[in-house]
């Protein structure tokens, strides 16, 4: 493992060894750890008590962060006629049908999210034509994440406002950006608790034992702050009831 630089070691010394922080303490500390010369993304990593090798224990979904991610997403929509007009009015960056499919087939991928109406998925044969291009990049429209939908306007607005997709990796870890270092502590905290609340609601029935195994937040260029998982479900429920 490569030796960390002096700056990283100095930041690491700000984290008490062996201590688990409350969500609010962790958010306060992670802002102090973001000392790079750019506005660092604050990332959340949650290890869940699931076995992702089993289909009934995979956790996948989307969440709309109340304060957004701090990054403007380029949204592409496969739609025609009235639905295409809805997409444009909602703020989609690229709207089209066969023209966009051909552009993507030729190597163009200058977008962050792809949304499609259910009918156009079939008429343009999007799964078979673009599956190998968009699938590995996590860009393939999918009903499970709300990117295959007839409510195009709502989907576009939500992704523009800060909707993010997530899924467990092969280790059972979910990675979600919860904002930028320039965000207020309140904004980062609200975004953090919103993600945890969403994960709690998506807990698979087949998952046994402790659900939140570990929770960490970190800036792009800094060390991770461990969050105490004890009573986290109660904290989430209190926050949602407030």
Swiss-Prot record:
Keywords: Repressor, Ribonucleoprotein, Ribosomal protein, RNA-binding, rRNA-binding, Translation regulation, tRNA-binding
GO CC terms: large ribosomal subunit
Pfam family of the protein (one): Ribosomal_L1
Record-annotated membrane-spanning stretches: none
CDD domains given in the database record: Ribosomal_L1 (cd00403)
Span of the signal peptide: none
Repressor among keywords: yes
Function: Binds directly to 23S rRNA. The L1 stalk is quite mobile in the ribosome, and is involved in E site tRNA release.
Protein name: Large ribosomal subunit protein uL1
């Amino acid at each position: 493992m490569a030796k960390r630089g002096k700056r990283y070691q100095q930041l690491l010394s700000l984290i008490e060894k062996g201590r688990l922080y409350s969500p609010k303490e962790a958010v306060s500390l992670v802002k102090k750890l973001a000392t790079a010369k750019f506005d660092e993304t604050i990332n959340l990593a949650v290890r869940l008590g699931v076995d992702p090798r089993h289909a009934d224990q995979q956790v996948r979904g989307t969440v709309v962060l109340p304060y957004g991610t701090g990054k403007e997403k380029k949204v592409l929509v496969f739609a025609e006629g009235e639905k295409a007009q809805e997409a444009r009015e909602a703020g989609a960056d690229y709207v089209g049908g066969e023209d966009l499919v051909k552009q993507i087939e030729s190597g163009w991928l200058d977008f962050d999210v792809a949304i499609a109406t259910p009918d156009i998925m079939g008429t343009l044969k999007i799964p078979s034509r673009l599956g190998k291009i968009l699938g590995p990049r996590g860009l393939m429209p999918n009903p499970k994440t709300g990117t295959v939908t007839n409510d195009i306007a709502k989907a576009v607005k939500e992704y523009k406002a800060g909707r993010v997709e997530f899924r467990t990796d092969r280790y059972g870890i979910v990675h979600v950006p919860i904002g930028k270092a320039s965000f207020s502590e309140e904004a980062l905290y609200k975004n953090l608790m919103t993600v945890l609340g969403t994960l709690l609601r998506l807990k698979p029935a087949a998952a046994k034992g402790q659900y939140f195994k570990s929770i960490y937040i970190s800036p792009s260029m800094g060390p991770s702050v461990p969050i105490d998982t004890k009573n986290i479900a109660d904290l989430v429920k209190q926050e949602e009831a407030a």
